[in-house]
Amino acid sequence: MMKDRLILAIETSCDETSVAVLRNDAELLSNVIASQIASHQRFGGVVPEVASRHHVEVITACIEEALLEAEVTAEDLTAVAVTYGPGLVGALLVGISAAKAFAWANGLPLIPVNHMAGHLMAARAVKELEFPLLALLVSGGHTELVYVSEAGDYKIVGETRDDAVGEAYDKVGRVMGLPYPAGRVIDELAHEGQDIYDFPRAMIKEDNLEFSFSGLKSAFINLYHNAQQKGETLSNADLSASFQACVMDILMAKTKKALEQYPVKTLVVAGGVAANQGLRERLAAEITDVEVIIPPLRLCGDNAGMIALAAVSEYNKENLAGWDLNAKPSLAFENL
């Protein structure tokens, strides 16, 4: 009987410390996540130094808990996977150092994983993916369309020229006085309000697959501040509905254009913003000629489960790292 392949994965690219254990291709035995949101909320965003310190404090306990929950020991493991970019350099280094130490101490190979490949391959938790496919990756740090010809072969075909969509959500949320992170709250408010403000939909009609959200963000902030100066009170629900409608129009337009240029049977939508109910509703209503796969909510945000799922194809291709593996905070798909 063939021995199960067990991969321990570590994710520390931003403000979540996460460790997971994956059995074979897609069975997550554990996915421990230690969130730092409470520590960053008073700053209105992630403070890199604070994030790194928190990772150092909890990484060992997370590894122990992941193994305990999975009911496996270090001796049972096949390999260790770790996010090495993109992300905050200090945060990444904590995870990489822990992964190296654990792998070295237990004589295990080390698998380097691109954080965004992790988001994309989280869809494997839903079903085994058929290639080629197109992916819309939407998060706090990225907004990009990726053509995947086969597992582990990624090509960015369109991306944001300025703000990522999740970043835009957090910035307008801060203006409205909403807690960080603001995406979920804005999504909820949007379902209560009306789309009554006409915000600019940048580049929506241009014949490319590029995104831009800085103009939308500026228009939102100007509208809000002008109303304040006049002593007017605007409805956060209506503002959220109008902002979200604009974002979704842009995302849907570019995704449809990409599907025209890259005829595939599957569209994967992943990243933290993939948890957005408004986005899921628009996808269900408007993308009907290809299969749309969205990871479960627990795998949309940063987590080590997705890193383990992405590590499978890297391991199968024998794409292993040496002990000199370093953090690559600006890592892109093209230079994997």
Swiss-Prot record:
Origin species: Streptococcus suis (strain 05ZYH33)
GO CC, one annotated term: cytoplasm
GO molecular function: iron ion binding; N(6)-L-threonylcarbamoyladenine synthase activity
Entry binding sites for substrate: 137-141, 170, 183, 187, 276
InterPro entries the record matches: ATPase_NBD, Gcp-like_dom, KAE1/TsaD, TsaD
Alphabetic keyword roster: Acyltransferase, Cytoplasm, Iron, Metal-binding, Transferase, tRNA processing
GO biological process: tRNA threonylcarbamoyladenosine modification
Name of this protein: tRNA N6-adenosine threonylcarbamoyltransferase
E.C. number: 2.3.1.234
